């Protein structure tokens, strides 16, 4: 409910408004025209017309103009240096002013908050200004509050203009804020409803698709079963084209093989291989002495006739491999390897053993036969002892020592393959098991047994 009351301004208040100010003269308000609609230029023109006409009946249009406000304008301050201490608690609560209470009740909470914030801003500005300006403002009274702005400040609103402008602007701001908040709430509600509806639609579509897929699957299964039944019926109706075999073998059960036999478990033997020795393993085809065999063998190698003429055998590395007994030193004898661990392998500086074909730097035997050459007469300590039962040191110090290949008793893989026999492999452990010291004696015993059996 708006208050539309008009009060006739007394002469004292009119004198206050008609008194000249610092910058320009204030001649009063124009009758029946609100101050909000007047600009700075129009207000000046209206004041000139009022001054020329000397209108005494000046009316102040404000619904908030009360007796207390009129008394404040009439009373004069005691001194120019006195400051305004503010309103009392009763004035703020509105107990003595029922009209102000009505206006405050019309305002909403947002309007009251805006008014309080504006009052705080005014207090901060007053604190920021120096004391002289404040004393001057208090000495003039409230006449400065109703001064019209100049042409430069025409667009800027005056904070101390009137209470009507203050309340109207506060109401407009509050209405705008409430409208914006309502719009935002409506948009949020609409968005939530749209999202929920979309999610519900998606879930419905997914459930419908899944149900459709299940229905199609069941229909396909039924159709396939019906088709298979029809095909089987057609096949059964035509036995001439597709004869049905009687399951004779299905009735017979296969005999289950047992993993272990009930009798005594026999030792598992390795399968026969081509590398294993034949039946006549160590049997020699001749029964001559070793010396005669060696003589015949070397004479055969030296006799390579071409047109009835003999050709001498070319000797290779004869000078480098032959060492007389006088050249053997104590260092050479100490360098002889007794076991396999004493052998040091060296592919650059080492020399090769005829039996094991390993290139080591230990001292090896030297064959004193004039027809022996190269690696043929070189045997290391372990090979000469295990395979033939001889010692390398005694062989080096013997000027008449001849290597096993020259004697025709070599049992290495190359020599046995050349003679048409298979390789023996590692037989030293088997020979020691049967009570022999070397492989040569074990092979000779086998040969004697075979000869005796024949």
UniProtKB/Swiss-Prot annotation:
Gene Ontology CC, one term: nucleus
Superkingdom of this protein's organism: Eukaryota
Substitution effect: residue 73 to A: Significant loss of interaction with PSIP1. Complete loss of interaction with PSIP1
Organ and tissue specificity: Ubiquitous. Overexpressed in medulloblastoma.
Phenotype when changing residue 72 to A: Significant loss of interaction with PSIP1. Complete loss of interaction with PSIP1
UniProt short sequence motif Integrase domain-binding motif 1 (IBM1), positions renumbered to this chain: 9-33
Effect of residue 16 to A: Significant loss of interaction with PSIP1. Complete loss of interaction with PSIP1
Induction and repression of expression: By MYC overexpression in a concentration dependent manner in neuroblastoma cell line.
One Pfam family named in its UniProt record: zf-4CXXC_R1
GO biological process, alphabetically ordered: positive regulation of cell population proliferation; regulation of DNA-templated transcription
PANTHER family cross-referenced by the UniProt entry: CELL DIVISION CYCLE-ASSOCIATED 7-LIKE PROTEIN, OS05G0300700 PROTEIN
Function field: Plays a role in transcriptional regulation as a repressor that inhibits monoamine oxidase A (MAOA) activity and gene expression by binding to the promoter. Plays an important oncogenic role in mediating the full transforming effect of MYC in medulloblastoma cells. Involved in apoptotic signaling pathways; May act downstream of P38-kinase and BCL-2, but upstream of CASP3/caspase-3 as well as CCND1/cyclin D1 and E2F1.
Name of this chain's protein: Cell division cycle-associated 7-like protein
Organism (species): Homo sapiens
Lineage of the organism: Eukaryota, Metazoa, Chordata, Craniata, Vertebrata
Gene: CDCA7L
């Amino acid at each position: 409910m708006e208050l539309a009351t008009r009060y006739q301004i007394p002469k004292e208040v009119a004198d206050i408004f008609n008194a000249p100010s610092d910058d320009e003269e204030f001649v009063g308000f124009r009758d029946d025209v609100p101050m909000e609609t007047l600009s700075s230029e129009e207000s000046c023109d209206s004041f000139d017309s009022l001054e020329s006409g000397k209108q005494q009946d000046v009316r102040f249009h404000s619904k908030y103009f009360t007796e207390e406000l009129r008394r404040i304008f009439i009373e004069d301050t005691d001194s120019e240096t006195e400051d305004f201490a503010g309103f009392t608690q009763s004035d703020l609560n509105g107990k003595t002013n029922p009209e102000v209470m009505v206006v405050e009740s019309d305002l909403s909470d947002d309007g009251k908050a805006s008014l309080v914030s504006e009052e705080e801003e005014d207090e901060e500005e007053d604190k920021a200004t120096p004391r002289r300006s404040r004393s001057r403002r208090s000495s003039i009274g409230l006449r400065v509050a109703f001064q019209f702005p100049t042409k430069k400040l025409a667009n800027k609103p005056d904070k101390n203009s009137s209470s009507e402008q203050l309340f109207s602007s506060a109401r407009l701001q509050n209405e705008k804020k409430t409208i914006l908040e309502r719009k935002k709430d409506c948009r949020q509600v609409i968005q939530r409803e749209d999202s929920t509806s979309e999610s519900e639609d998606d879930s419905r579509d997914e459930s419908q698709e899944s149900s459709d897929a299940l229905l199609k699957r069941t229909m396909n299964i039924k159709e396939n079963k019906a088709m298979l039944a029809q095909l089987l019926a057609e096949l059964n109706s035509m036995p001439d084209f597709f004869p049905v075999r009687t399951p004779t073998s299905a009735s017979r059960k296969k005999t289950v093989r047992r993993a272990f036999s009930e009798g005594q478990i026999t030792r598992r033997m390795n399968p026969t291989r081509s590398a294993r020795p034949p039946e006549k393993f160590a049997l020699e085809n001749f029964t001559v002495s070793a010396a005669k065999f060696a003589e015949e063998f070397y004479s055969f190698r030296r006799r390579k006739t071409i047109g009835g003429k003999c050709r001498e055998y070319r000797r290779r590395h004869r000078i480098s491999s032959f060492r007389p007994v006088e050249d053997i030193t104590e260092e050479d004898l100490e360098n002889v390897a007794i076991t396999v661990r004493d052998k040091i392998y060296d592919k650059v500086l080492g020399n090769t053993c005829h039996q094991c074909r390993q290139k080591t730097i230990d001292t090896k035997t030297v064959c004193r036969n004039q027809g022996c050459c190269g690696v043929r007469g070189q045997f290391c300590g372990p090979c000469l002892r295990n395979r033939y039962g001889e010692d390398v040191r005694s062989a080096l110090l013997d000027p008449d020592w001849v290597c096993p290949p020259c004697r025709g008793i070599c049992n290495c893989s190359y020599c046995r393959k050349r003679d048409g026999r298979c390789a023996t492999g590692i037989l030293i452990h088997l020979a020691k098991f049967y009570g022999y010291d070397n492989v040569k004696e074990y092979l000779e015993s086998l040969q004697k047994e075979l000869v005796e059996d024949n």
